[in-house]
Amino acid sequence: MARVSGVDIPREKRVEVALTYVFGIGRTRSKEILASTGVNPNTRVRDLAEEDLVKIREHVDANLRTEGDLRREVQANIRRKVEIGCYQGIRHRRGLPVHGQRTSTNARTRKGPRRAIAGKKKPGKK
C-alpha cells in the first residue's frame, strides 16, 4: 500500500480519488497536486511508478498542511475563538450551530438527541 502523509491510500482507486483519503486533501486539491507533479489522474495507485509516488509525497509534504498538523491548527483556531469570546466561540462553547443555521427546529446533530421537558404535553388530535 502506498503511503502519503502517514496515510495508506487504497491501491485499487484512481490516484485523484485515493489522495482524498488524506485529511486536508479534497478533489480540487488532489487535481492541483497531480497537475503540478505531472501525474495522470486516471492512473490507478497500483500502477503508479515509484518515482511518481515520491513526487506526490514530496509535493504534499513541502506545500500542504495535512493530517495531524491541520487538525491541530483547526482545534487551535476553535480554542482561540472560544477564549476571546466572539460569537462563533460562544456557539462552539454551547454546542450550537456556528454558521448561522436555524435552531428552532433541526440542528439535531449539534444539539444531540431531544430531551423531554417535564410537564409539557403533546397536542392531542381533535
Curated annotation (Swiss-Prot):
GO terms for biological process: translation. The keyword rRNA-binding applies. InterPro entries: Rbsml_uS13_C, Ribosomal_uS13, Ribosomal_uS13-like_H2TH, Ribosomal_uS13_bac-type, Ribosomal_uS13_CS. It holds the Pfam family Ribosomal_S13. Keywords: Ribonucleoprotein, Ribosomal protein, RNA-binding, rRNA-binding, tRNA-binding. Residues 94-126 are annotated as: Disordered. Residues 108-126 have a biased composition (Basic residues). One of its GO terms (cellular component) is cytosol. GO terms for molecular function: rRNA binding; structural constituent of ribosome; tRNA binding. Belongs to the universal ribosomal protein uS13 family. Located at the top of the head of the 30S subunit, it contacts several helices of the 16S rRNA. In the 70S ribosome it contacts the 23S rRNA (bridge B1a) and protein L5 of the 50S subunit (bridge B1b), connecting the 2 subunits; these bridges are implicated in subunit movement. Contacts the tRNAs in the A and P-sites. Part of the 30S ribosomal subunit. Forms a loose heterodimer with protein S19. Forms two bridges to the 50S subunit in the 70S ribosome. This is Small ribosomal subunit protein uS13. The gene is rpsM.
